[in-house]
Amino acid sequence: MIRIGPSGSTTQAKSTLEAVDIVADMGLTALEVNYVRGARASEETTRKVGAKAEQRGVTLSAHAPYYVSLNSPRDEVRDSSVTHIVETARRCQWLGAPFFAVHGGTYGGKESPEATDGVVERILTVQTRLEEEGIVGVKVGLETTGRPSAWGTPEEIGSVAEQTDIVIPVVDFSHVHARSGGGLKTTEDFQALVDWALEVSDCQLYCHFQSIEYGEKGERRHLPVDRWDPDFRLLAPVLRQIPCDVHLIC
């Protein structure tokens, strides 16, 4: 099944609880709860959102804080980044959300292999903390990034997934398109990326799609889907043929 919905509360909603109703009333079936400025929502409120979503047939995911930086040269930033991920996972468990998206941050002045090793180390710490704190059934979705300065190519994310038990990729098609200088030009380009993600994630696809403005340094800003860059009409037939669940955030 393909489930489609927005990230964050709509402009009409005063709360995430209201956003669930608005999304469902629009005929959409997915919502990404934004914790981009901190995962601080109370357990009571979060469980109410999860119950409302289940009642209305909306599948939830979440987005971790933007200030996660797993390769920061500062110990306290790396440690707080781990905590941000753990706290997002905790709220996903309360929500009944099976996964959430997180950006890994920059390379921290390191080459790709060393930076990837650093991400593995931090994710293994997250994995241990989740086990110790009884947070189960939630996957950490490492999101593909839109700038060469940001850690998060498909190859890097795949390497972390291979070395940990809790990681799946979050394929942001616009980010991949921008980082590659407009590389998603054909249905075959999208198919190859989707095939990779399904293999790494054991046949589940959590993805983002928007159009995007980009330049030599990658992404500049997100744009409405109907700017057709990348072209959703090339991706649609690929999504229709996927034999497992798709969680598409637009």
Labelled PLM ranges:
Residues 12, 16, 39-41, 70-72, ...:
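Active-site-proximal flexible loops/turns
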Residues 113, 151-154, 177-245:
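Gly/Pro-rich active-site loop or hairpin
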Residues 44-51, 78-85, 116-121, 154-158, ...:
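Charged helix-capping and loop-helix junction motifs
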Residues 2-8, 31-33, 60-64, 100-102, ...:
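Hydrophobic faces of well-ordered beta-strands that scaffold small-molecule active sites
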Residues 7-11, 34-38, 65-69, 105-107, ...:
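Active-site beta-loop-alpha junctions enriched in small/polar residues
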Residues 54, 71-171:
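Active-site acidic/histidine proton-transfer and metal-coordination neighborhood
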